[in-house]
Amino acid sequence: MRTEYGQLEGDLDVSDHFALYGLCAGDITVHDGGALHLYGMCAGNVDVKPGGCARVYGLCTGDVVNNGGEVEVRGMVIGDIKKNGGATVIQPGAKVRMVE
């Protein structure tokens, strides 16, 4: 699994297995076959495409949008959780605001 501990400027496309312990200053898009493990912070939105997977253990200040993949939230999402398809699981103790 690829890991990043620093700060990433701009948007990020994930099509592999990627663990972010640092900060992404832009949006993150998780594509088919990609798996994001967000332990740090995303200052934008997280968009999960069909076949993608995102696990949010840390903080997302924007929206988390499931467009047909798998989303699991254990951390905090300041924006909205938008379920447009796929499977979305909010674990007990997660801090979120839901929008169907």
What are these regions (language model features)?
Residues 1-100:
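Extended beta-solenoid/beta-helix repeat architectures
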